[in-house]
């Protein structure tokens, strides 16, 4: 069947199937943790089968199910990607409706993961099924991945390393983006700083013992000084960043310049500090977790080395390590545009 682009869009606009699909996805819990996506992957498989598309459910770990389906032929290859798991619906949250109700009311739909990202997942899945009924040029792959909320090791990363169907010319990711098209996101590097001291009774502070918290306090300004480290642009990545900044300016209004500049520099958030057991004991240990976000042109290894050099100039006893080693899929936070 051949259908025009306009007819396809009109058909989607007149059909309530997308809303119904999203409601059904919301009624299937896929909280992570624990991360069990068996039921939602099975539902998607049946949904695609109902549209004449065979999908493969890939279990990478007990309870961790991913789903992949490919249609079409040819060299040009677009991948549609969304994740199946959601942030947990925690006890004590002020829900006005049950979190797995999929309730549609007054032009809105309610449920855990409606925004992140079962809304995007439903849109990709629905369009994939619709396009499968048409004659189109090239290949189209749908991937529903798991484990996104806890790092992706058993979801997207596993599939990228094991399944060539995910290696397309481009990927359209359904993550919420403020209704603007985004070309990527800043790389996240979570770094742990650890200081060791020597415990003693608090009444002897300054005479005996070594306060690990104070050791950490002295180096935290050095960590924060990495805030604003500028990106290292090529001509291409500078041009792409400027395009995305235009979207930020439109989205954030009067704060546009400030918000847009976040794409040009490193951000540093000293997120957690742990240390000490009682206020009358000199703390023997202190741990700080730092969330750094990288612009184009700066690698995880480079920012960690910058931090380590600054810290060790003042206190070489501070341990600097990864919370979880970054999973490198490409050598940069940006891999360049394709030829097509």
Task: Mark where each language-model region is.
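Metal-dependent amide/peptide-bond hydrolase catalytic core
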Residues: 2-6, 30, 190-340
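Active-site beta-loop-alpha junctions enriched in small/polar residues
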Residues: 31, 83-85, 145-149, 325
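Class I S-adenosyl-L-methionine
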Residues: 42-49, 125, 132, 304-315, ...
């Amino acid at each position: 069947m051949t259908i025009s682009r306009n007819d396809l869009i009109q058909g989607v606009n007149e059909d309530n199937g997308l809303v119904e699909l999203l409601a059904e996805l919301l009624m299937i819990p896929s909280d992570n943790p624990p991360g069990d996506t068996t039921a939602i992957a099975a539902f998607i498989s049946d949904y695609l089968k109902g549209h004449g598309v065979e999908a493969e459910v890939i279990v990478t770990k007990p309870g961790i199910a991913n789903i992949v389906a490919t249609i079409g032929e040819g060299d040009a290859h677009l991948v549609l990607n969304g994740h199946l798991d959601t942030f947990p619906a925690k006890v004590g949250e002020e829900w006005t409706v049950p979190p797995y109700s999929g309730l549609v009311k007054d032009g809105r739909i309610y449920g855990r993961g409606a925004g992140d990202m079962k809304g995007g997942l439903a849109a990709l899945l629905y369009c994939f099924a619709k396009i499968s009924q048409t004659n189109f040029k090239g290949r189209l792959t749908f991937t529903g991945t798991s484990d996104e909320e806890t790092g992706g090791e058993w979801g997207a990363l596993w599939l990228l390393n094991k399944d060539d169907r995910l290696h397309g010319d481009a990927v359209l990711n359904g993550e919420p983006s403020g209704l603007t098209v985004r070309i990527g996101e800043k790389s996240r590097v979570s770094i742990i700083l650890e200081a060791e001291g020597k415990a003693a009774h608090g009444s002897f502070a300054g005479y005996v013992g070594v306060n690990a918290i104070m050791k950490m306090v002295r180096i935290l300004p050095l960590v924060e000084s990495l805030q604003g480290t500028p990106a290292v642009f090529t001509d291409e990545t500078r041009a792409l960043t400027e395009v995305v900044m235009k979207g930020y300016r439109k989205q954030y209004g009067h704060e546009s310049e400030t918000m847009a500049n976040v794409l040009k520099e490193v951000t540093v958030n000293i997120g957690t500090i742990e240390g000490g057991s009682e206020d009358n004991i000199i703390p023997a240990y202190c741990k700080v977790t730092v969330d750094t976000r990288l612009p184009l042109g700066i690698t995880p290894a480079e920012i960690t080395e910058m931090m380590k050099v600054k810290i060790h100039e003042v206190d070489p006893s501070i341990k600097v390590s990864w919370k979880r080693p970054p999973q490198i899929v490409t050598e940069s936070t940006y891999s360049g545009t394709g030829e097509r």
